Amino acid sequence: MVIHLGDHWDMPSLSSYDKGKKSYEGRRYKADVDAGNEGMEMLLSRVKRMKNRPRMVFLKGNHEDRITRLIESDPYLEGAVGFQDLNLDAWEVHDFLEPVEIDGVHYAHYWINPLTGRPISGSIDNMLRTIGFSFTQGHRQGLWAGRRELNNGKAQRGLVAGSYYQHHEKYLGPQGNFHWRGLLVCHEVHDGDYNLMEVDMPFLRRRFGPQS
């Protein structure tokens, strides 16, 4: 099984935060879509050669959801732009913030405080206590992993991993780009618990990148 936690398409052309800034100049919707589709083709190239393809789950992130907000603010664009532009045919797609439960672990792009609508944040221990069940999310750069042993003999897992890329983010500045980046493999997933294996970007480059 492969689970993509979202924000594959960055969609900077639809960013409401950067409009009017010099850095916004030259951004185009089509360029954003094409970049994400090209990356998706690269991601799926090995999977498509497999005889027995795994279940593949894609959770829309807040960056993909910029398309939804665009159509809501400018309804005349409906049909001209939309999620049909994104190369998601190979995936079981779930809407932004829609929870998906698999083997006792609940997945979403991020988890919100139901009273405020804001993302639950803080330390992984705080998130475990606040959310109350085994969860995995993306959204935040870096890696946070936690485990609570419960009095009923079960365990609660918390996992936050929202960075799978090689570039630096300008908005994070010169001191904010040292976060962990990579993918995670969860073995023996059952009843909300699992054995966790971290696979960081430097390892992936050495193992699968061009050989000099």
Predicted regions and their residues:
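Alpha-helical hydrophobic/aromatic positions enriched in membrane-embedded helices and signal peptides
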Residues: 53, 101, 130-131
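Beta-strand-turn-beta hairpins that frame and shape the catalytic cleft
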Residues: 100-106
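Short, acidic/polar N-cap/turn motifs at the starts of alpha helices
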Residues: 95-99, 183
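Core catalytic region of metal-dependent phosphoesterases/phosphodiesterases
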Residues: 1-92
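Non-catalytic C-terminal accessory modules of carbohydrate-active enzymes
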Residues: 209-212
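Conserved beta-sheet core of the metallophosphoesterase superfamily
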Residues: 106-203
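A generic local structural motif
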Residues: 45, 93-95, 120-125
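General small-molecule cofactor/ligand-binding pocket signal
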Residues: 57, 89-96, 108, 159, ...
